[in-house]
Amino acid sequence: MQKNNENILRRGRLGSSTKKEVMNYMTSLSFDKEIFESDIFCDIAHTKMLMEQNIILEEDGIKIINELKKIYNNGMDCLNLDPSLDDIHMVIESELIKNLGEDVAGRMHTGRSRNDEVATDLRMALRDKILTILKLLINMQKNILNLAKEHKETLTIGYTHLQHAQPITFGHHLLSYASPMERDILRLIDTYKRVNICPLGSGAFATTGFNINRNATKELLGFDSVIENSMDGVASRDFILETMANLSILGTNLSKICEEMVLFSSCEFGTIDLANEYTSTSSIMPQKKNPDVAEIARAKLSTLNGNLVTVLTILKALPNTYNRDLQEISPHLWDSVYTTIDTLKIIDGMISTIKVNADRMKELTEKNYSTATELADTLVRECNIPFRTAHGIVGEVVRLSIENNKNMNEVIRDVLDKFNLKLDDSKIEKALNPMENVKMRKVIGGPAPEEVERAINSYYSRIENYEKEVNDKIEKIEIIKNNLLNL
């Protein structure tokens, strides 16, 4: 039987000897709050299975489950978070033994190790967070699509190398945010499949001699399947790596949006205005309106890459199966998860509240020869010359326009005469008109308003499917949790 203040983990092999600074250094309790709920559910499911398999008495199992539900309702902060107990698993078990006695509560851990327990907890906690991130992504995607629809005919300039390139619409530009975001959604949905597999029953790494039922706990906890190799069950953390890699990719995509919010809201671009609540001012320059939120988000998203590399480095060359090194993955995982969640909310709000300067956008399309490509294309179509030849001719038109401080319309005819080419004035005017440029580009993925409208509807249709899939998963997990709490 447990004595007062006796450490149930160390008492047998190690005795009562502990050193406070070592215990504080080793404990994972500071970040185990992320798996507290999952650990309770894991304990309940495991206990229920032990009862059904007649490994423990039903009356003992019922007492354990009822006490676990009390701990769940009271929360982690009501427990004795003694660092010498290492982690939340032993804290909960110690609390159970204190309240029920070791002869009852000491049976809960039968046929199980902390190794398969924590692996199960992590997967359960992470799947919840993945679904949260997916909900935020889907909501942001819909908001971007709504804004794109509003600006499907709003002319703006497109860039390559951050130089004026060709006219497009702002709606088309916004779809360039929606497109990679859809891939982010698909990656996380696919990753969920590999997160939602159950290691419980793997034991320390070699399963157990007790007649446990792994499929029963899999069903109770809402997993799709079990991990068939017990060594891999406790050792695998690639599901964490995959999730963090996906978050790094997502963060990279989001950082581009932040960068463009900074650029486009500057005086030099002046194409958008950020809402005041997403900016700050200077302590010395009273006129300043700084895009600090976008800058902070851009910086925070960089930490996702650092966290990923840290976890990769921790995992590199670890021997099978469980090593305590794995504990140090968790802070980096949860930091990436919460940085992603917080930043998605911020960026979504920032984009949804921008004010678009359509006049400035249109003005930029009329500068710096952005319609030169269509002029070359027109020469190909109307004069039946090779594109490379047309490219050279229009390049000369641009050069002469710059040298003589003229626009292309004032130079083109002299250059065409030089090459013995004829082109109607109406064709020239159409080729040099930014909106006509845009309207002609109606192939799939193009900036023509009708194509942007089609693309938006296509995105909406797919988003509805993703949203239903995510909501179904959330509903399933909520049912699982309610069922466990009502055992």
From Swiss-Prot:
Among Pfam families, the record links this protein to: ASL_C2 (PF14698), Lyase_1 (PF00206)
Organism of derivation = Methanococcus aeolicus (strain ATCC BAA-1280 / DSM 17508 / OCM 812 / Nankai-3)
List each coiled-coil range: none
Primary location? cytoplasm
Which CDD domains does the record match to this protein? Argininosuccinate_lyase
According to its UniProt record, the EC number is: 4.3.2.1
Compartments where located: Cytoplasm
What reaction gets catalysed by this protein?
2-(N(omega)-L-arginino)succinate = fumarate + L-arginine
Molecular function (GO) terms for this protein are: argininosuccinate lyase activity
- Annotated metabolic or biological route of this protein: Amino-acid biosynthesis; L-arginine biosynthesis; L-arginine from L-ornithine and carbamoyl phosphate: step 3/3
| Similarity section | Belongs to the lyase 1 family. Argininosuccinate lyase subfamily.
Is the Cytoplasm keyword given for this protein?
yes
Q: Does the keyword Lyase apply?
A: yes
Name recorded for this polypeptide: Argininosuccinate lyase
Organism superkingdom? Archaea
